[in-house]
Structure formats: C-alpha cells, structure tokens
C-alpha cells in the first residue's frame, strides 16, 4: 500500500537537520524511499525546496540537497493543480494546499510541521500523524489504512 502526500518544506528541513533516524520527520522521508509514500510536487514546489535548502543558515551539503530533490522527483508524481481560491495565513503555502486538493480523490495528505498555516482538515497532518496512519505501533508493523492509502500498482 502507498499513500500520496505533499511535503511542506519545513518537513524536509527538519529531516535534514536531525541526527536521529527514529524521528517522525526522518521516518516520513524514509517512507518515500521504501515506497510507502508517493510525494506529490510541481516545479514551483521543487524550486522552493531548492531555494530554502540552499539557505546559508542550514549549511546542508549540495550532495544532501540534490539527493532529497532527486528522490522526490524519482519516486514522486508531478501534479498540475487547479486554483482553489483558498486564503491561507501564509500564502506562500498555497501551492502545497492546491496540490493536495488536486489529489484528494486519491486521499492525498499534506504533511507539515505548521498545521496552523492551513485549514483544519483531517488530511493535513504532522509527520507523527502520518506515521500513525502508516504504522500501527512502534514495532513497525504496518497498518493498512485502506480508506487513506492506495493499493500497490496504483499510479
């Protein structure tokens, strides 16, 4: 089973900043590589990721930045969103919201550390909440949330 999800930039930053592999932000990124999460993106999101991850205050290596961007493009799905007309606290976040709305028929999620920047919806989740959706407990037993995830082989 796989879930579609849009990753807010802050989740990528947190995953690259952490030294621990057991954090929710690190685990949601690992879920891309394992095929449990299919990232949704468009060029505007890739450009934002690239710009923010290159900011000097983070000091991420070019190799780490390119690796995560390649993983998103390689394992992800490009989406051309329709305008929603939604007004958000931070309008720079609108592209993430519009992409998740474009794929809501496929039960897509938006994963963010800034829940308050978005409307309160059950598909806008923190990295920890996404891990609860994917996994039953800390032993790593997979929980298949059929109403939220896609069967294997679904594009």
Please report, for each region that a protein language model flagged, where it lies by residue:
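Acidic, PIN/NYN-like endoribonuclease modules and their adjacent C-terminal/linker elements
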Residues: 105-109, 113-155
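Acidic, metal-associated active-site segment
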Residues: 90-109
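Membrane interface segments of multi-pass transport proteins and intramembrane proteases
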Residues: 58-59
């Amino acid at each position: 089973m796989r879930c579609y999800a849009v990753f807010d930039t802050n989740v990528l930053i947190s995953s690259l900043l952490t030294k621990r592999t057991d954090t929710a932000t690190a685990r949601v990124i690992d879920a891309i590589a394992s095929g449990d999460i299919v990232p949704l993106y468009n060029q505007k999101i890739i450009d934002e990721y690239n710009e923010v991850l290159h900011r000097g205050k983070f000091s991420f290596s070019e190799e780490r930045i390119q690796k995560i961007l390649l993983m998103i493009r390689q394992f992800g799905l490009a989406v051309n969103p329709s305008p929603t007309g939604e007004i958000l606290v931070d309008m720079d976040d609108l592209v993430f919201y519009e992409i998740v709305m474009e794929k809501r028929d496929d039960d897509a999620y938006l994963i963010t550390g800034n829940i308050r920047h978005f409307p309160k919806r059950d598909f806008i989740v923190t990295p920890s909440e996404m891990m609860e959706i994917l996994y039953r407990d800390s032993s790593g037993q997979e929980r298949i949330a059929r109403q939220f995830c896609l069967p294997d082989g679904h594009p």
